[in-house]
From Swiss-Prot:
It holds the Pfam family Pyr_redox_2. The keyword Iron-sulfur does not apply. This is 3-phenylpropionate/cinnamic acid dioxygenase ferredoxin--NAD(+) reductase component. Pathway: Aromatic compound metabolism; 3-phenylpropanoate degradation. The lineage of its organism: Bacteria, Pseudomonadati, Pseudomonadota, Gammaproteobacteria, Enterobacterales. The gene is hcaD. Part of the multicomponent 3-phenylpropionate dioxygenase, that converts 3-phenylpropionic acid (PP) and cinnamic acid (CI) into 3-phenylpropionate-dihydrodiol (PP-dihydrodiol) and cinnamic acid-dihydrodiol (CI-dihydrodiol), respectively. FAD binds at residues 5-36. GO terms for biological process: 3-phenylpropionate catabolic process. It comes from Escherichia coli O157:H7. Its EC number is 1.18.1.3.
Length: 400
């Protein structure tokens, strides 16, 4: 019997790791990856950090160039897909070529959620999703330039840190009452706000842009009535899933391709993962997790499901952010207001713990990444703690 053919659509973390996972889990059939980018699939996290700060930055490939040939994975870069061919099982390219598939994994990622008021500025307005975006930003983030960043989420704050380190004058505008409100617990939000302010970043909370005038500098009028002058305007206010191909194929979409716990779409032969995917939970709610690790998890889960293997057990959600000299790692459940702190954040070394009825359900480390392995095990096992154990620095965490 002829082995099935699997096609992967996308050029990022989830797409590359799906190819790797399929081979690692024993798939020996024909395997193709189609991407509209010219590069090998590359790591996205460095785009807001090292790609802006290093003297001679290089894209970091998810897998080395030799891996693709050695593992007999056919890589099609710089191509545009016209249709997925859900009914015919034939992927059609813009150049007219068609490619048969038996199973399909879609990992087309996401674009920056548009902000029409700023998009009208054309090339004077920047977002960050791809390597080309980082290259353009690197050119314009020059010393003494005034930079306005709209959005104080993870990307906005990482860009603020990088621009400040490039000696720009940075202002961040955030509609909410805090920074990183979607991702960080209250004590970490307060720490990051103070950290950026101490670095010279002006952060305007509970505010938004009302009017924009393009001139020698961009003039931005805020809801508060204040007017800002900017050489560079950047925004990051969320994502818009690249789900057009899926919508045209009549897959279930809601700003993302709806998947189940096996990364399967409403078509049993089509799977999706990474930022383009949104999971329908058992209670019917839709949940999206935008992180490097989530892309890897989706790749492993989808590969197992495609091959009819048991699904891997998922670790607690985890992501990291590098801002200035700080490395913050977030693991587990970030909800709740009653967090314990071990150490002193003012020394830039601390761990915040989230206990629920004595059970550790989440944590954030500040320049204490070596503790993440133990914390992950504790969260997975549902380990209980006395609050004094976790906060007493005289008690080594590894002894608990």
């Amino acid at each position: 019997m002829k082995e099935k053919t699997i096609i992967i659509v996308g050029g990022g973390q989830a797409a590359a790791m799906a190819a790797a996972s399929l081979r690692q889990q024993g798939f020996t059939g024909e395997l193709h990856l189609f991407s509209d980018e010219q590069h090998l699939p590359y790591e996205r996290p460095p785009l807001s950090k090292s790609m802006l700060l290093e003297d001679s930055p290089q894209l970091q490939s998810v897998l080395p160039a030799h891996w693709w040939q050695e593992n007999n994975v056919h890589l099609h870069s710089g191509v545009t897909i016209k249709t997925l061919g859900r009914d015919t099982r034939e992927l059609v390219l813009a150049n007219g070529e068609s490619w048969h598939w038996d199973q399909l994994f879609i990992a087309t990622g996401a674009a920056a959620r548009p902000l029409p008021l700023l998009d009208a500025l054309g090339e004077r307005c920047f977002t960050l999703r791809h390597a080309g975006d980082a290259a353009r930003l690197r050119e314009v983030l020059q010393p003494e330039r005034s930079v306005v960043i709209v959005g104080a989420g993870t990307i906005g704050l990482e860009l603020a840190a990088s621009a400040t380190q490039r000696r720009c004058k940075v202002t961040v505008i955030e509609l909410a009452a805090t920074v990183m409100g979607r991702n960080a617990p209250p004590p970490v939000q307060r720490y990051l706000l103070q950290r950026h302010q101490q670095a010279g970043v002006r952060i305007l909370l509970n505010n938004a842009i009302e009017h924009v005038v393009d001139g020698e500098k961009v003039e931005l009028t805020l809801q508060s009535g204040e007017t800002l002058q900017a050489d560079v305007v950047i925004y990051g206010i969320g994502i818009s899933a690249n789900d057009q191909l899926a919508r045209e194929a009549n897959l279930d979409t809601t700003n993302g391709i709806v998947i189940d716990e096996a990364c399967r779409t409403c078509d049993p032969a089509i799977f999706a993962g990474g930022d383009v995917a949104i999971t329908r939970l058992d209670n019917g709610a839709l949940h999206r997790c935008e992180s490097w690790e989530n892309a890897n998890n989706h790749a492993q889960i989808a590969a197992a499901a495609m091959l009819g293997l048991p699904l891997p057990l998922l670790p607690p959600p985890w992501f990291w952010s590098d801002q200035y000299s700080d490395n913050l790692q977030f693991i587990g459940d970030m909800r709740g207001d009653d967090w314990l702190c071990r150490g002193n954040p003012e020394t830039q070394k601390a761990i915040w713990f989230n206990l629920q009825n004595g059970v550790l359900i989440g944590a954030v480390t500040l320049n204490q990444g070596r503790e993440i392995r133990s914390i992950r095990k504790w969260i997975q096992s549902g380990k209980t703690f006395d609050a004094k154990q976790l906060t007493d620095e005289n008690i080594a965490l590894k002894s608990l």
